[in-house]
């Protein structure tokens, strides 16, 4: 068949996105791709790199994801009862949904209530610096045409993304907008839910943080694809054969107490040594590719101690990820890393 294309309005022109479908198990994953000959050189790069470019490119990405995402679902004929906004990057889905309801003849007040009643927002970031804020000038450059379609003024739209409506100096925050247009908001653990209540407390003035509709849903993993092969073999040997089909049953997990400490430790060491081998290989290849001094490679890699406690930090190196927390108490850190009886090493890896 023909390539599906979604036309997403930007300024006074359209960005044309190819739609690709990837089958992930039984789930269809739809991807938007602006790198095609219908777009300008500047717009072809919108989908080149996640989190890439300046704030203008970031806004263009979020327009594509949010507004373009809803337009894609419409073109595919997919209509759902609930829309889940996973982090603030996709918050603009609710701008397009309000526009669609108003186009059908509803008032803005009716439209936003319908959107709120069918929207969930998951926040992942525990600090304000991790949320996207856009200056009014930049936001208006791309979103200036939407208030009339929503049946509201420009100031009304800006206020939906402000902690303090009416404050002309405050930037538009995608996360605040998501909170204001979603019936339910959740963090990704009990503690993160509490932190998020405090973080968003200023949105709902006159209420205590715990009175807000910010809750939590604890993050989980997909066991068959997340667990290492070595651990899956251990579980298969000691757990009930129906384990995979009843993973949420606490009784099934009690079988772990029947596994000897020696077997668990052996499995952990196998995994640890695989990690160390991988680090050595990758570090060596990268160092040589960058024309580093070969003699230094041996010196550096020999310092990796398989018998030391290895503490890993694997996250994107953004400021709010707080990789520097390790260095907040240097005296205590010095005591830990200089103890010859209990050696400790740290592995930092970015994305």
Description of each model-found segment:
Residues 1-351:
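Catalytic cores of carbohydrate-active enzymes across secretory and cytosolic contexts
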């Amino acid at each position: 068949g023909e390539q599906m294309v979604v036309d997403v309005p930007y300024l006074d022109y359209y960005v044309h996105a190819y739609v690709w479908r990837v089958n992930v198990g039984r789930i269809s994953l739809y991807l938007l791709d602006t790198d095609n000959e219908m777009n300008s050189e500047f717009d072809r790069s919108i989908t080149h790199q996640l989190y890439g470019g300046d704030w203008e490119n970031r806004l263009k990405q979020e327009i594509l994801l949010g507004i373009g995402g809803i337009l894609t679902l419409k073109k595919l004929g997919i209509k759902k009862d609930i829309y889940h906004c996973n982090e603030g990057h996709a918050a603009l889905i609710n701008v397009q949904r309000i526009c669609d309801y108003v186009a059908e003849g509803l008032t803005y007040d009716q439209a936003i209530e319908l959107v709120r009643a069918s929207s969930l927002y998951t926040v992942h970031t525990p600090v304000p610096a991790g949320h996207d804020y856009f200056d009014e000038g930049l936001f208006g450059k791309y979103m200036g045409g939407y208030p009339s379609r929503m049946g509201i003024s420009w100031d009304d739209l800006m206020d939906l993304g402000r902690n303090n409506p009416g404050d002309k100096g405050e930037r538009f925050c995608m996360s605040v907008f998501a909170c204001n247009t979603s019936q339910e908001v959740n963090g990704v653990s009990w503690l993160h839910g509490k932190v998020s209540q405090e973080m968003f407390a200023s949105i709902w003035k006159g209420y205590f943080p715990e009175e807000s509709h910010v809750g939590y849903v604890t993050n989980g993993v997909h066991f068959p694809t997340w667990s290492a092969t070595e651990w899956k073999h251990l579980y298969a040997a000691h757990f009930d054969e129906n384990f995979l089909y009843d993973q949420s049953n606490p009784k099934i997990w009690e079988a772990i107490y029947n596994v000897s400490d020696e077997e668990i430790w052996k499995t952990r060491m196998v995994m640890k040594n695989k990690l160390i081998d991988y680090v050595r290989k990758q570090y060596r290849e990268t160092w040589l590719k960058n024309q580093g001094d070969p003699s230094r490679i041996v010196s550096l890699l020999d310092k990796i101690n398989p018998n030391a406690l290895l503490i890993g930090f694997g996250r994107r190196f953004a400021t709010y990820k707080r990789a520097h927390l390790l260095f907040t108490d240097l005296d205590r850190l010095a005591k830990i890393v200089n103890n010859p009886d209990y050696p400790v090493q740290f592995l930092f890896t970015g994305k």
